[in-house]
Amino acid sequence: MEKVPGDMEIERRERSEELSEAERKAVQATWARLYANCEDVGVAILVRFFVNFPSAKQYFSQFRHMEDPLEMERSPQLRKHACRVMGALNTVVENLHDPDKVSSVLALVGKAHALKHKVEPMYFKILSGVILEVIAEEFANDFPVETQKAWAKLRGLIYSHVTAAYKEVGWVQQVPNTTTPPATLPSSGP
């Protein structure tokens, strides 16, 4: 069950530090192993996201009605979106050495989700938390604290760039749908 957050403000600043060379290598090594199973990992991430935060489905007419995780896993539309999400993440991870490229990719993602899809930016933070959960589970025995911190730093960097794009296009926080409350951020984690 979701909790309704207090005043969720886009103005709240996330830490946005560039990753060190060691952090980039740690993220890229983990990512390479995840990306080898791109579609399955992406589907696992989105299914968990939609099961734990069902209000996020409001932005997806093609599968907003789905409640059963197995039905979601089999959905061609969900699988396609999972591949798009993983592809965007792959572009970011592969270009961590190039801050301008990372910024450009995340600006495009942020602007599209703000202008075309009207997605509340908090869902990026929630989704990135789900991604970290899945990574931690996939590499339960091989996810040292340093790598976890590097991924947490990347999470902040992604959210910072995406919310900057929302601000750039003049995003105004949407009034929550009364039948589907917005999700809160997970209380645990970095």
Swiss-Prot record:
Enzymatic class: oxidoreductase
InterPro entries, A to Z: Globin, Globin-like_sf, Globin/Proto, Globin_lamprey/hagfish
Record's catalysed reaction(s): Fe(II)-heme b-[protein] + nitric oxide + O2 = Fe(III)-heme b-[protein] + nitrate; 2 superoxide + 2 H(+) = H2O2 + O2; Fe(III)-heme b-[protein] + nitric oxide + H2O = Fe(II)-heme b-[protein] + nitrite + 2 H(+); H2O2 + AH2 = A + 2 H2O
Region (Disordered): 1-21
The Globin domain, residue ranges: 18-167
Post-translational modification: The formation of an intramolecular disulfide bond between cysteines Cys-38 and Cys-83 specifically enhances the nitrite reductase activity.
Phenotype reported upon loss of the gene: Homozygous knockout mice display marked vasodilation with lower blood pressure and systemic vascular resistance associated with increased levels of nitric oxide.
The entry's keywords: Cytoplasm, Disulfide bond, Heme, Iron, Metal-binding, Nucleus, Oxidoreductase
Enzyme nomenclature, EC number: 1.14.12.-, 1.7.-.-, 1.11.1.-, 1.15.1.1
Activity regulation as described: The nitric oxide dioxygenase activity is activated by a reducing system composed of cytochrome b5, its upstream reductase CYB5R3 and NADH.
Compartment list: Cytoplasm; Nucleus
Chain sites annotated for binding heme b: 81, 113
One GO-annotated biological process of the protein: response to hypoxia
Single GO molecular function: iron ion binding
Disulfide bridge partners, by residue number: 38-83
Subunit structure: Monomeric. Homodimer; disulfide-linked in vitro. Also homooligomeric in vitro.
Function: Probable multifunctional globin with a hexacoordinated heme iron required for the catalysis of various reactions depending on redox condition of the cell as well as oxygen availability. Has a nitric oxide dioxygenase (NOD) activity and is most probably involved in cell-mediated and oxygen-dependent nitric oxide consumption. By scavenging this second messenger may regulate several biological processes including endothelium-mediated vasodilation and vascular tone.
Family membership noted in the UniProt record: Belongs to the globin family.
Protein name per Swiss-Prot or TrEMBL: Cytoglobin
